[in-house]
C-alpha cells in the first residue's frame, strides 16, 4: 500500500502545483482551510449519489422501464469514472488505500482501478504530456510507427480522429489494449497485476450475477450501458491535449455547458486541472473564472466553447492527431519543470 500511496501523494502534493501567481496561491491556501475543502462534503455527496443511483437503477429497472433505466445507467456509469478520477487525485481522503477501496467496484466493467490509476498518474507528468511513448493517455503515435502503419491502420486512426469515430472506435481500441496488457501480465507472471485482475474479475462476476438476479441481462449492460458510458468519456478527451512545445499550452480550456460540467466534474477546465492536480473538482470552475485571462494566455488560446464545437468541426473532418511532431528546444530545455 505505501508504494501506491507515495505515487498518489506525489501527484497531489503542493510541489507539483503550478500557480498562476501569488494571489492565486493565497486564495487556494484559504480555500484549503475552508470547512468545505476540509470536510470534502461535495465529494462524499457525489459518492453517495453515484453509488445510490447506479444500484437503484439496476434494482428498479422494471419500474423505470428498460430504456429510461439504460439511459440513467449510462449517466451513472460515466459519472462513476469521473469519481474514480477524483479518488486517484487524493479525494475525499488523504489515504490512497481507502480511496482505492471506494473506487474498486467494477461498475464500468473494463478497467481495474489500479490500471486506471497507474496510467493516469503517468499521464500527469506535464513535461511528457502528449508524448506517445511516455503519456499512456496520448492519441498521438510516434513518427516511426506512423511510417510503419499500413493504409488500413492509417485509415483507422483517421476515423478515430473524427468526433463520431472517436466515440465509436476509441473505447473498443482501449478495451483491446487493456485486455492484451492483462494477458501479458498473466503470461509473464506479474504478481501484482495478476492479483489486481483476479480481484477485478471476482468482483465483476459477483456484480453481474447480482444484476442477472435482478433480471437485467449482463450482456445488455456491457453492450448498451458500459460501452456507451466509455464513449461519453471520449467526448471529454476528444481534443483535450495537443502537442505544443510549452507544456502549459498542451491542455484545453473547454467552456462547456452545465450538464457536461456536472458529468465530467469540471475537467473541461483541463488546463487548470493539469496545473493544480490536487485541487478538488468543485473548485476548478471558480479558479478558472478568477484567472480567466491568465489561463488563456498561458495555454496560448487553446479554448473551445463547448463540446458542440468539436462535434460541428470534426463530424466529417479528422483532427490532426497522428504522428507526434516532437517538442521544440524550449520544451527540451524546460523539460523537467512541467
Regions found by a protein language model. Give the residues of each.
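Non-catalytic, topology-defining segments of multipass membrane proteins
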Residues: 1-76, 106-122, 126-219, 223, ...
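Generic hydrophobic, aliphatic-rich segments that mediate packing or membrane embedding
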Residues: 67, 83-84, 97-102, 116-119
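Transmembrane alpha-helical segments that form the membrane-embedded catalytic/substrate-channel core
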Residues: 74-87, 112, 116, 163-171, ...
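Glycine-/proline-rich flexible loop or hinge segments
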Residues: 81-89, 99-106, 270
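Juxtamembrane helix-capping/reentrant segments at transmembrane boundaries
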Residues: 92-111, 133-149, 247-261
Amino acid at each position: 500500500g505505501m508504494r501506491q500511496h507515495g505515487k498518489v501523494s506525489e501527484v497531489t502534493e503542493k510541489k507539483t502545483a503550478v500557480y498562476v501567481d501569488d494571489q492565486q496561491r493565497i486564495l487556494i491556501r484559504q480555500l484549503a482551510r475552508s470547512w468545505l475543502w476540509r470536510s470534502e462534503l461535495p465529494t462524499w455527496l457525489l459518492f453517495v449519489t453515484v453509488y445510490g443511483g447506479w444500484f437503484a437503477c439496476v434494482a428498479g429497472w422494471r419500474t423505470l422501464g428498460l430504456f429510461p433505466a439504460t439511459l440513467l445507467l449510462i449517466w451513472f456509469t460515466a459519472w462513476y469514472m469521473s469519481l474514480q478520477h477524483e479518488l486517484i487525485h487524493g479525494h475525499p481522503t488523504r489515504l490512497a488505500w481507502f480511496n482505492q477501496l471506494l473506487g474498486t467496484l467494477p461498475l464500468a466493467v473494463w478497467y481495474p482501478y489500479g490500471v486506471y490509476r497507474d496510467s493516469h498518474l503517468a499521464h500527469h507528468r506535464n513535461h511528457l504530456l502528449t508524448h506517445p511513448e511516455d503519456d499512456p493517455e496520448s492519441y498521438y503515435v510516434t513518427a516511426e510507427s506512423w511510417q510503419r502503419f499500413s493504409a488500413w491502420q492509417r485509415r483507422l486512426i483517421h476515423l478515430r480522429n473524427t468526433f463520431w469515430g472517436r466515440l465509436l472506435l476509441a473505447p473498443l481500441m482501449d478495451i483491446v489494449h487493456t485486455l492484451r496488457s492483462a494477458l501479458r501480465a498473466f503470461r509473464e507472471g506479474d504478481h501484482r497485476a495478476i492479483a489486481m485482475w483476479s480481484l477485478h474479475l471476482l468482483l465483476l462476476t459477483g456484480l453481474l450475477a447480482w444484476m442477472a438476479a435482478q433480471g437485467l441481462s449482463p450482456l445488455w449492460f456491457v453492450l448498451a450501458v458500459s460501452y456507451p458510458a466509455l464513449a461519453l468519456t471520449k467526448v471529454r478527451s476528444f481534443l483535450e491535449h495537443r502537442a505544443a512545445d510549452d507544456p502549459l499550452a498542451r491542455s484545453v480550456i473547454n467552456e462547456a455547458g452545465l450538464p457536461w460540467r456536472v458529468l465530467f466534474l469540471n475537467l473541461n477546465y483541463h488546463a487548470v486541472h493539469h496545473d493544480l492536480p490536487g485541487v478538488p473538482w468543485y473548485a476548478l470552475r471558480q479558479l478558472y473564472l478568477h484567472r480567466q485571462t491568465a489561463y488563456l494566455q498561458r495555454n496560448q488560446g487553446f479554448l473551445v466553447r463547448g463540446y458542440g464545437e468539436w462535434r460541428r468541426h470534426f463530424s466529417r473532418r479528422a483532427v490532426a492527431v497522428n504522428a507526434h511532431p516532437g517538442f521544440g528546444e524550449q520544451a527540451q530545455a524546460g523539460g523537467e519543470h512541467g
